[in-house]
Amino acid sequence: MNAQEANFDGLVGPTHNYAGLSFGNVASLNNEKSVANPKAAAKQGLRKMKQLADLGFAQGVLPPQERPSLRLLRELGFSGKDADVIAKAAKQAPELLAAASSASAMWTANAATVSPSADTADGRVHFTPANLCSKLHRAIEHEATRRTLSTLFADRARFAVHDALTGTPALGDEGAANHTRFCAEYGKPGVEFFVYGRSEYRRGPEPKRYPARQTFEASRAVAQRHGLAEEATVYAQQDPDVIDAGVFHNDVISVGNRDTLFTHERAFVNKQAIYDTLTAALDARGARLNVIEVPDAAVSVNDAVTSYLFNSQLLSRADGSQVLVVPQECRENANVAAYLDHLAAGNGPIRDVLVFDLRESMKNGGGPACLRLRVVLTDAERAAVTSNVWIDDTLFTVLDAWIEKHYRDRLAPDDLADPALLVESRTALDELTQILRVGSLYDFQR
């Protein structure tokens, strides 16, 4: 059956800021309390969407979540009118106001794990929103994520949108940032690859400096609820040493697409066994695994973390060749730039490298891959997505003007205490729901 991989990028929200909330994310910590530019952040992401759509790739957009989250602040004991809640939180616990104001839902690679209909037992596309329970500012996202996905993918005969797994450390789930899929063609049955950092109940190596956010138990639960074939599901442990070096999700150290795995040589525990298992599973699905392993001598783990070489999008063109979408930081790192030149000049599947300015997102630890959720859809499934979320000339122009109208070009940590920011954000989001035709998506609209 004919199918295409669509990328749904998160639109950066009006409260984009640098609060340093993500322990284990080096960029986030290094840029704590810097002044952010929400308008630039949103436009940088939108330009990437538009350019990829212009190149013929299926490109959708997911709306921001409502921030600041008054629901969280009230749950934490702050009371009164909305402005009073914000003022009390700013005075008594500014760190909680920062968590409630985070625009981290922009990184939709963490929104959910997605399995296409070709892989699932019931022939539907399955979505499991990630519980993101390792961080407060992200643990509040999954309910709104489920609501958004249920709105966009509303046809229950074609789509199954699950609740997130129970938010406990044993089931820590970070979504598609630790998942990829290999296949001969998008519409044919493939092999789903789940990467975890630790196991709650099995003994094994664990990082010592930074937390492992994804558990084996969570990955297995997602695979089981999606109805994946056991012989076409592969689990791998990320090397704990690279987690301690700042690789907080697997998409910071490897990326896969179709029959290609682009990875650092230090990405996995027992890597050869993983390659062999993937090769055998994919062989049974009519494809041969192509591993492009970047040696540590050419690009160190530190180079990978600072440049986000592997937090790239690996996209297939109609002719079968692949293009690597990287942030401009890759061109600013001499080792990474040299490797990319070598890669593009070779005879491998990756023939082209596209470079994007995503500086505002990158300063918070989010590159091209963080900003997108991959959803493989058949023609009929794509037609069932009736909201106005597919990027084209018209939608790009409307969204660009919407950002220009509603977003600030400067947001410092102290600005989160401004009650006008809540009003501005709600006004913007209310208008956005009309643009995207998604109905009353937000709590304040209900």
Swiss-Prot record:
Reactions performed catalytically: N(2)-succinyl-L-arginine + 2 H2O + 2 H(+) = N(2)-succinyl-L-ornithine + 2 NH4(+) + CO2
Keywords in alphabetical order: Arginine metabolism, Hydrolase
Active site positions, chain numbering: E174, H249, C370 (nucleophile)
UniProt cross-references to Gene3D superfamilies, sorted A to Z: Succinylarginine dihydrolase
Enzyme class, UniProt record, top EC level: hydrolase
Xref: InterPro entries: AstB_sf, SuccinylArg_d-Hdrlase_AstB
Pathway: Amino-acid degradation; L-arginine degradation via AST pathway; L-glutamate and succinate from L-arginine: step 2/5
Pfam families the record matches: AstB
GO molecular function annotations of the record: N-succinylarginine dihydrolase activity
Domain of life: Bacteria
Protein's UniProt keywords contain Hydrolase: yes
EC number: 3.5.3.23
Residues engaged in binding substrate: 19-28, 110, 137-138, 213, 251, 364
Biological processes per GO annotation: arginine catabolic process to glutamate; arginine catabolic process to succinate
Known partners and oligomeric status: Homodimer.
Family: Belongs to the succinylarginine dihydrolase family.
Primary role: Catalyzes the hydrolysis of N(2)-succinylarginine into N(2)-succinylornithine, ammonia and CO(2).
NCBIfam families recorded: arg_catab_astB, PRK13281.1
Matching HAMAP family: AstB
Protein name, per record: N-succinylarginine dihydrolase
